[in-house]
Amino acid sequence: MRKVQLVVLLIVLTFGCSPKTFNIKWTKEIAPENFTTRFETSKGNFDIALERSLSPKAADRFYQLVKHKFFDNSLFYRVNPGFVAQFGGNDSVAYKKWNSVTVPDEVVKQGNTKGTFSFARGGKGTRTSDLFINLGNNSRLDTLFYNEVRGFPSFGKVTSGMEVVEKLYSGYSDSTMEHFDLMITNRQEFLKKFPDLDVIEKVYLVD
């Protein structure tokens, strides 16, 4: 009997106390008007300061994702030199859950200058959990009309550590995008193809 109790306790400790990957209530959380996040990566650390008024719904979602550790252990899976460094989730379950609740489209209030920060998207109503840092002055992204939506609203900027961002491995450039689904479903196989990609070890709020 005692052996059974110990087994049950072990199961509870192993699974019952594991962190949740998603709760629909999290998508209702509101970000502070201004906040800063720190990225600890395989190349070093950098900070991004966010301003909610520039894209309120985007800021809320990013705040939610950071608060609930969505980006921890994820990859900078697309680094196009002089253009963008893009990242997102790496857990197939969490990725699917978060992406089931899209972020409403918003107008561009701040341009995509070097060091600014925006959500990636593939058209109208597709902002979810993938973002990019501008590695150059990408003003065309302010007005680009694609799949019924115009522009990529930036809502933050790298305030320290831009030299770290610029050192992220960029040798694969956009070629990784052809294997994006593999990254989500089988990270190990994805990394066999692209072993030099840099990792986001963790992201957290610093104020």
State the predicted function of each range:
Residues M1-N23:
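Bacterial Sec-dependent N-terminal signal peptides
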Residues C17-D207:
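Cyclophilin-like peptidyl-prolyl cis-trans isomerases
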